[in-house]
Amino acid sequence: MEIDESKRASSDSLTIYVGELSPKTLDSDLFRVFSNVGKVLSVKLIKRAEPVSSFAFVTFENEEDAERAIREYKHYELHNRQIRVMKKDERPPETGNIFVKNLPEDFTGKDLDDAFSMFGEIVSCKVATTSHGKSKGYGFVQFKEKKAAKKVIKNFSSLDGLLLGGNRIVVELYNPEIKKGESKKTSATFTNCFIKNFPFDASEAELLELLERYGKVTSLFFPVKDNGKPKGFAFANFENHESALNAIKNLHGTFPFGAGRDGTGEAFYIQKGQRKEERAEELRKMFEQMSMQGQSYKKNLYITNIPEGFGCEELGSIFKEFGNITSISVGVDGANSQKQYAYICYSTPEEASIAVERGNEIYLDGNRLQVAYFKNKLERMKEKEFGGGLGYKPGVPYMYNQGVSFASRGFKRERNRGGAAKPYGNELEKLHSLVLAAAPSFKSQWKDFGVGNEVEFANKVIRAFRSRSEEEIKDMIDLNFVLTKNIASAIEDDNSNDQVLL
């Protein structure tokens, strides 16, 4: 059936803007979320390094679904961030924006909407949060018209602020530098310092005397062991930020107790003290920046030198100590049938980093495990081009080396005469790893699909894909949302075949 182009809605009315996205968000995530509203034709995701947020354009088949998505997903949270959803033509410049601070801790984007909707039509609003979803105490409201924002400022000035949830909030016209400045305010000024690398026999009084040469110390946390000896670290809180900076400037990297005195042998360490959540937030941002720059700080790990007899269950029980495992598969080393390898995917890069650091210390039946970040074909080609790369070990079977086979159901590469792998088989193996990683997203459909785990799921999907052209296979490898759509179609086709047989 042909569609009369004159009756088709304009592309702008079919497309919505989705902003404030986490770097963790993939186009497949957006496709899955908005497919609950209606048929999604395309997702165009624009990834940007923090602190600038990523955004996307989602195009629906009809205008009603696009409008419904804006209404129903106005305050939706994805990867611990409240996303911004609006019409494509209502994006910034943000002339109708206001900045609201001193918000109650439990205040949400919906609460902001309820509080300010009396002043005019609101396009979007959000409360800034940490990666764990905790409010930072400030937020932003964007009105459709600038005069509504000015009306808010005028009213709040005459009322000398307004009490919301017990807090007297402050409202200002949005300044692009405010958002950047607020996020850096805490790290810019501090008084608490973390200290280590002092002599084993140093006393609390001795350390305090040293620190107070540079400013008044209001408190000193100096933990000791059961035998009375110091644990080797301390926290000092100075009266003001300048004193803390002065101590760091004059003491860090020096030997204030004398180089010959019994101690760690390392220079004195004093730096800004951070709460656990602050350290986690900085680490998260570091991983996101590195990931955006194409570095191998990922969630997928490749483990080798595993003795035979250790399956997914045994390895999972060992590696779950380091974080939440989303998928795991074990394969047999083609070069040595008595050794195995595994792929493990964690829910966050931070967890994967811990597993790499500590996993290499694990011995199984006398075999020391070799744990590294999974490298795709392009990364390995670059390593080879520039001299082999760090951590490359000849003889260790990478995913595309000859002899690769999966323990479950025997998925193998196709070969040319003489043992060389066919290019098409190469692509299928790469696609297999992507389907394997996506398997947990379809867990609710495993039973109807007739599979019980990730490997069975991936193998069955790949069998369905074998009839596809090489061009289709490459599209699925390159575009997450295309892969997601094709997996869903494979499941649907399988269910349809079952109905026919019945």
UniProtKB/Swiss-Prot annotation:
Biological process (GO), any one: regulation of translation
Compartments reported by the entry: Cytoplasm; Nucleus
Major location (coarse): cytoplasm
GO CC terms, sorted: cytoplasm; nucleus
Domain RRM, chain residue ranges per copy: 14-90, 96-176, 191-275, 299-376
Pfam families attached to this UniProt entry: RRM_1
Keywords: Cytoplasm, Nucleus, Repeat, RNA-binding, Translation regulation
Keyword Repeat: yes
GO molecular function terms listed in the Swiss-Prot or TrEMBL record: RNA binding
Family: Belongs to the polyadenylate-binding protein type-1 family.
Function of the protein: Binds the poly(A) tail of mRNA. Appears to be an important mediator of the multiple roles of the poly(A) tail in mRNA biogenesis, stability and translation.
Protein name: Polyadenylate-binding protein, cytoplasmic and nuclear
Organism encoding this protein: Encephalitozoon cuniculi (strain GB-M1)
